[in-house]
């Protein structure tokens, strides 16, 4: 498994200093509906500490920073690519190659 990022994301990481990407599963459990979805976002130092120490997320070092992954099994393609998305000036991370 190889983690890559697009040049736009790499430039944003260098400019902003946000070099930790968090991959977490968000679950909505309602009486009529159950939804599980991956949520990928930047994590600050405090959030990183919470997810590594308390939630036992594993850390993968990459050439562009760290990726925090949950302990439960996810399906990874051979190459996982992270890219930058910008909507109305708000930056977020997209992923390709990770499935629940």
Predicted regions and their residues:
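Domain-level signature for proteins that mediate thiol-based redox and metal-cofactor handling
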Residues: 1-29, 33-100
